[in-house]
Regions:
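Glycine-rich phosphate/adenosyl-contacting loop at the front of the ribokinase-like
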Residues: 1-59, 245-247
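Short beta-strand scaffold segments in enzyme catalytic cores
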Residues: 47, 92-96, 228-232
Length: 305
């Protein structure tokens, strides 16, 4: 395992989940409970790794009172982080959860970063990068940051002897692939958007992933929800999934946990893919976006399809 897995989350958040008995538009809805946690895709990868004893450090822009709160939340979980100071405040995302498990989300757009702040974010990653380390670039890009941010960073990480994993969407994902990351982790919708079609069958998914692999040289790890995940890399394509039904508590953060699991272990691709699906499964079983420790029970249910 590499010395430290770095993550960079250009648009992190403080996530507040409110439990409401019911949700009525235009009325006063009273919450009977609230839960606050640090969030953002890269932050979640680092949290998952830290919870399983794997060294990871989150690099993120932090500004405003919300940024101070984000720091405190990370420190409460003993998550190692590098704060890049920015002028505008970190965003707050609100989730409203009804007893039937349905979640309604309202996400703030987040800060506008200056060119200098975006550059400082990239420089902070490179300053903490050791040879052979993984860097995970994850999530949406905040306003003010070029769509080429991940592509540029991937290239710089590669030239510095590191390995870059990309987990984003839209233009940031499409353009990010130009930086030839070592790994990309789209979900089904993101892969479909990337390859310009619908992907109704597993064969379609494998064909689309192979197309991305062929055109970019990047290994492709596709998260498929209850169908597990596929990996298209150097060797034959692989598919791992859970062999029996799993009680779903929350799908939030499952893809982030899956990516964390893949990066947490060394060994043959099939072993890493099985570990990835085990971590994703642990996340789905947990009501929070953070799964906590992955157990042998989580691993036992994963089969190579």
């Amino acid at each position: 395992v590499s010395a430290v897995i770095l993550t960079v989350t250009p648009n992190p958040s403080v996530d507040r989940t409110l439990d409401v008995a019911s949700l009525v538009a235009g009325a006063v809805n009273r919450a009977n409970g609230a839960h606050v946690e640090p969030s953002g895709k890269g932050v979640n990868v680092t949290r998952a790794l830290a919870a399983n004893g794997v060294r990871s450090r989150a690099v993120l822009p932090i500004g405003g009172a919300e940024g101070d709160q984000l720091r405190r939340l990370l420190e409460e979980e003993s998550v190692s982080y590098v704060a890049v100071p920015v002028t505008e405040p970190v965003r707050v995302n609100i989730s409203l959860r009804t007893p039937d498990g349905v979640v309604t989300k309202v996400n703030e757009p987040g800060p506008i970063l200056s060119w200098g702040e975006a550059d400082a974010l990239a420089e902070a990653v490179l300053a903490h990068l050791g040879h052979g380390d993984w860097v995970v670039g994850a999530g949406t890009l905040p306003r003010g940051v070029s769509d080429d941010f991940y592509a540029d960073l991937a290239e710089r990480v590669r030239l510095a002897g590191g390995r870059f994993a990309l987990d984003s969407s839209g233009a940031a994902l499409r353009k990010g692939l130009a930086g030839r990351p070592a790994l990309v982790k789209p979900n089904l919708d993101e892969l479909a958007e990337l390859t310009g079609g619908t992907l109704p069958t597993l064969d379609d998914v494998l064909t689309a992933a192979a197309k991305v692999r062929r055109t970019t040289g990047t290994d492709v790890l596709v998260s498929l929800g209850e169908e597990g995940a596929v990996l298209v890399g150097d060797g034959p394509p692989l598919h791992a999934r859970v062999g029996k039904p799993v009680r779903v508590a929350s799908t939030v953060g499952a893809g982030d946990n899956l990516l964390a699991g893949f990066l947490a272990v060394n060994g043959p691709p099939a072993h890493r893919l099985r570990e990835a699906v085990a971590w994703g499964t642990a996340a789905v079983r947990s009501p929070r976006s953070l799964a906590g420790a992955v157990t042998d029970d989580d691993r036992a249910v994963v089969v190579l399809a």
